[in-house]
Structures are given as structure tokens and as C-alpha cells.
Amino acid sequence: MTKLYRIEGTFRYEGEKYECDVHSYGTLEVCKIPGAPEECDVDLEYVETENCIEWDEELEDWHRIEACDLPEDVVEKIEGEALERLRVGDYKEVCLIGTKE
């Protein structure tokens, strides 16, 4: 079964606080920032990772999980080190917040 994870919450961009409005693009979930380019080439200054949710196929809805400790095979399939750095709290320029694979 395909597992879909995403980190949901707030982030700061250019000093302004935004809620994370997530849209799906192919197999990746990205954060759409108001006024940002479609390719989401922006700097996220701060991302709260305590709100981690997982897609439940049976319920067909998101449900919250206790921690953002994603399986290593999931992390390995994410482009770059974006989510890995989020997991360890080393925030960097990142747009990617999840994966379907």
C-alpha cells in the first residue's frame, strides 16, 4: 500500500507567518505560498514539524501521528535532504514536505 505523509503546520516566509496550504503535484506534496512562484522556489525560514499527519486509505482522510519519525525508506526516496533536515531540526531552504512513494 502506498503511504503518503506530509508535515502540516505553520511556517515563516520573509518575516510573515503563513498556514501551510498544501497542494499535490504528482508524487510530491509542496507548500503553496501566497504570491510565490508556481515552482515554489522560495526560502522557508521556519517550519514546525510537530504536526505530522499520515493518509489513511481506509478512512480516506488524514490522521495525526505522534511523531515525524518517517521510515528510512520513505526518507531515502525524497529528493535532496529537505525532509531529513526537517526531521533533525536543521531548517534550510526547503519546499518539499512529503512524499507518496
What would you call each of these model-derived segments?
Residues 31-101:
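Acidic, low-complexity intrinsically disordered segments
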Residues 1-34:
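Short, charged/polar N-terminal "headpieces" of proteins
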